[in-house]
Amino acid sequence: DSPISEAGIAGMGVGAAMTGMRPVIDIMFGDFSTLVMEQMVNQAAKIHYMSGGKLNVPLVLRTNLGATRRSAAQHSQSLHALVAHIPGLKVALPSSAYEAKGLMKTAIRDNNPVVIFEDKLMYNDKAPVPEEEYLIPFGEANVKREGTDITLIATSSMVQVAEKAAELLAQEGIEAEVIDPRTIVPLDEKTLLDSVKKTSRAIVIDEGHQSY
């Protein structure tokens, strides 16, 4: 059994990845990803480059984001934007069970460290997931709904919110385009910019902090 030590779990994961394994480590609350910053920022994200490309760290860190019922402040944060600013780490934000499986499969095959943030509010959702193998490429956004009047860029569980908003807007004669980036590192800038060029308006719906 792994110790209840986030730093220990991450350290063992980095070491295992360096020796050729493809570990998936689980940090139960994304809030406690602050306890693995040394291992993820100064080790996992940099070893490939500091070794002149001789070493890879194919590590997947699975954790979560967002608030949930009966959770204190230190269990209700969304730190994905902070992690996305660390060079060398990839960040995925699945918006459904289907996306979660496909992105996880892709992450495991990636030779770089990947952090997957799952929204706590979606853990009770039930949805069909294909049993057969499938992958969802990183850096390819999913246009959930096409529109011409406004672009709604939504991440994680906020994709469901955006889709409901688009339905309400349609009743008012406003056609909203809903886009799920799937990954914010790498980010599919082309799909997002092409949509905004078409609609001339954009709203970002994300559980991260609005300002610094």
Regions found by a protein language model. Give the residues of each.
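Thiamine diphosphate
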Residues: D1-P113, F117, K120-Y212
